[in-house]
Amino acid sequence: MSEHIDIWLVGNTGLRNPNRIQEGFSVFASSSFVGKLHGRENELGFMRLLDEKGIIQNEDGKDVSGSHARKWRLMFAKNGFIYPQVKKKDGQQEDLGRLDDITPFGRAFLNADTYAAVQECFLRAMSVEQFPLPDGEHYFSPLRWLLAIMLELEKRTGSSELSRIEFALWGHTTNPSYDLESVVDNILDLRQRRAVAPAKRAFDKKEIAKRGENYDKKSDNFLDYSDMNMRYLRISGVLQRKGRGLIIVPTKHILAEKLAKVTASKGPIIEQYRLLCSGAPLPTDNVDVAKALLDDLMKQMKDRHILFDITDLPLDTAAEINIARRRLENTLAQTDEIQYAKDQCNQWQEIRDYMSLIIKGGGKLVYDEDNAIEVPKDEMPAYLEWILWRAALAIDHMVNEPYEVRGFKLDSDFLPVSAAGGGKGDLYCEFEDFAILTEVTMSTSSRQEAMEGEPVRRHVSDAVLKYDKPVYGMFIAVHIDTNTAETFRHGIWYTKDDKKQRLDIVPLTLAQFQKYFVAMFEANKADPILLRSLIVKCESRRGILESPAWKQYIDEVVAEKSQKLVNRLPDQKHRIAPLIPAGAIVNDVCWGNGQVVALIANFPECNKTCVELPYLMSLPDEVSRCADGQTLLHDRFGEGTISGYVVVFKNKILTLNYPDSFIKGTLNMV
């Protein structure tokens, strides 16, 4: 009988990121839909709730059937967080639990407050044998089957690595009804033939077409489902990325060996459901296995000369041993993150490419068949924080550790799990003589100011009080709303004791930041001092420009400074006339201190040669200043140029030419 291929799905293509499940499940757990997720009205209602809470984006009411809710329900049930539906042939629903009600394991999942705890929940769920074999009588665990394949590969080749195309053709298309050795034979044959193929893409396409002859759905599914399946399998914590494929996590090798299984279970599915909903046991629940895993981890850390100390922890029970192991895993993760941070200066081009994807609205960039980057459209907020964190690491010279800079969580592949929570800034970069607090948002509408204006200023204010050094704020978004720029242009904040602060916050588009970031690396001059100089220059005219002009000025400064870096041009050394704020105090070597009360401007369209405008408090409402600081726009007279300022000294009122009087060295701003 010919082979009939059936691709198993540990996840769902409508919910490609398992890291979002806990957030959605938390919304569900506090809703009126607990125990009521079936039926059109409930599905539509829960979908609307997910949309309202920002968990999904049901653009323009695109989904009117409630399919979003069904996809989330499927993932809740498949992982044992709610009671799944029991078919009549398999038993009675009441023997398991009320349909769609939260299970004891679901409660444990809600209480998982670390990423390691979340991973363990998924690992317990994926270890359950609940996927039917073609005979309809046996059930298997895709994770355990795949681990068996990878361990056999390691036995033969020395590495458990499984590439994307290998997983696509011989990973999720097989199960324990196949012979393990034959599957690995096919993988190694594919690997050998592909290694000598001159055109990898054409080779892969041909192999997919050949394997697809025994598959009755779209052949695109081989690769499309691969990416989703591998992402779900990685959240178990036992597997991690290797290129676009998978490899067993070195510190979890013993656990992988204990979990691997080449046979299927013949027990009734309702028994597997009971196991699933109560929290399936893991090998690490056994003292001996837990101790073996801990000993192996300590050996690996000693081999890498990583210091650790767990002498203060009891090691009598499996739970205590696992607590000690998690402490060491955290130390190891921090050490790996420091190494990752050191390498970011060599990854600036990839960082640039990620920024480009975010600016475009997400998507994928394929370098070659084995290397690609992707920004999922529904994860752009997390990826924006993440890529700016990587940019900061690439610029380097920080005195705080990389894991102290960020507020968001990372997975074992250093990819973002979710955006940072509220209550603090996004990225805290502390340098020797100053600190930069970076805040980011994907919001682009006029709501941007309402959402970000207050928290960003509060976070920068808190940082000013915390650090005994200058603090600069960078607000980065794909688009900067003018109302947001206006809030940061003033930058006023009052502390709890009513102390007034004028905060230094510069709004930059992601494209502007990207331009300057790339220029620094192309010029081989990546340095936080240059970033500070950009911020200082951008904010230099905020006091005299209206927000539209200030945004334009920022764009001009970024372009000018980027060009100078790329062309290796030094900054101008000649004196530049200062920008004169309304009511400014100036000092003249002859007349002493004086105050600006008016300005003189030339408007070609006006009958008068010169027009005097009051300038003690601000420009008149009918006049605005352009980004260059010297050009004015008058509602009636059109465009004009500042040619002088009227200054009141103690015994004299003088009209001083601009810019000449302000660059000859006898007159200074006070």
Predicted regions and their residues:
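Donor-sugar nucleotide-binding helix/loop cap in glycosyltransferases
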Residues: 1-331
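Short, mixed charged/polar active-site loops
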Residues: 424, 435, 639, 662-666
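C-terminal, charge/polar-rich interaction regions
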Residues: 548-577, 639-644, 648-653, 658-660
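Basic/aromatic-rich interaction segments and small domains that mediate binding to polyanionic partners
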Residues: 587-622, 627, 635, 643-670
